[in-house]
Swiss-Prot record:
PTS EIIC type-1 domain mapped to chain residues: 116-476
Keyword Kinase: yes
This protein's name: PTS system N-acetylmuramic acid-specific EIIBC component
Native source species: Pasteurella multocida (strain Pm70)
The PTS EIIB type-1 domain, residue ranges: 1-89
Coiled-coil boundaries: none
Amino acid sequence: MATIDNAMIHSLIQHLGGKSNIQSVTNCMTRLRVTLHDSSVVDKDELKKIQGVLGVVEADEQLQLILGPGKATKAAEMMKASLGDNMSSPSLQEIARTQKQQIKSAQTSSIHQFFAKFATIFTPLIPGFIGAGLLLGLATVLQQAFVAGVENPNAFLVDLIAYMKVFSKGLFSFLSILIGYNAAKAFGGSGVNGAILASLFILGYNPEATKGIYSGLSNFFGLTIDPRGNIIGVLIAAIVGAKVERWVRKFIPDSLDMALTSTVTLLIMGCFTFLFIMPIGVYLFNGMSWLFSNLNGNPLGTAVLAGLFLISVMLGIHQGFVPVYFALVETQGFNALFPVLAMAGAGQVGAALALYFKANKGAVLRDQIKGAIIPGFLGIGEPLIYGVTLPRVKPFITACIGGAAGGFTIGLIAYLGFPMGLNTVFGPSGLLAIPLMTSPNGVLPAIATYLLGTVVAYATGFITTYFFATKDVDLS
């Protein structure tokens, strides 16, 4: 298994065009994201040959190197240290060339770029989703096993369960504010303005209500205020608010920017939110909930969703499903779509295992799979996608078939009257998702359904790859 060391970082910098060509370095869970002055001087073929690089992806103005979980963070830190103060300012010619590349990219892939921004909104929240979801899952298991139906349950256990659940309640009570903050920043506005606009969807507008925080407004100049629309409305308000803020800033003198830009932006966007975004958000939210609720209850629909999910990951638009997750949690009480889509990763694992057994002992492919299979079991599929199945095409297709089979299984069980889903908006997939499963019938039936779908996806991905996707495929 490749390690991140100084020699590897030196090779990466060399084939990225040298230190002077690197503008900035960031990372996510599995990718090293490098912003370059000139992407034309990058040697992508040599980058792919470096031990430990599982794939190279071009997205927006970034070059993304797939390294795997944990390794991306270490590589980013080491590369920043190596670059030091050598990340030079670009020349006028370089600026012009970069602007031209960005404009061309915007003309050809604006939809992809829009969905890519969702990653910057939701990715920072994922650890919190996972932590709160795991605690809620464990608390639910303890409650059903030792408290439900017990005449005199242990007082300490009751308090412990309540304590473990409080984090999930806190997360969901104020999650809209976090999303509003991140969304505004992602689209070029001030995060705090996005958070304030998001709070309009949380506040109450009924002075007689006994729950929530009363806003002090019972109507908007005589018009009824309906703060429904949930995350859809929050996203629209924050994104439009960022655009309005940038427009307002053009007319505000620099000396008054701090005092007036946000003031004017909030006045405009508050009115726009109450009059248009909230009503529209309700219809969009309800329509999205209806569509995916019906797809989830249809085994053919779940098969299609699971089968196509790897393609959405490959295109970088899979973050677009996150608003749907919120809609499902709001309407159903759990995220029924997430475990269906997680079957795509299970199909990928099955396909990779088939390639491992088909490859000869000592083959480089076997070493690649060894390094990526454990993260694959734990729900991190990018190393397998970009390093193993996608470059060989046929195994990628059979991995999608495996995911479709797992999705069909979960959809069929839901169709028979036993729906299930994730107990939080977002969480880990793979085997790590097991304790987060829930259903109206209890936690254990939900876990059993998820495991059955996963096994079916593993098996289908393995069998279809082993028998139909290795001929004329590079197994070296």
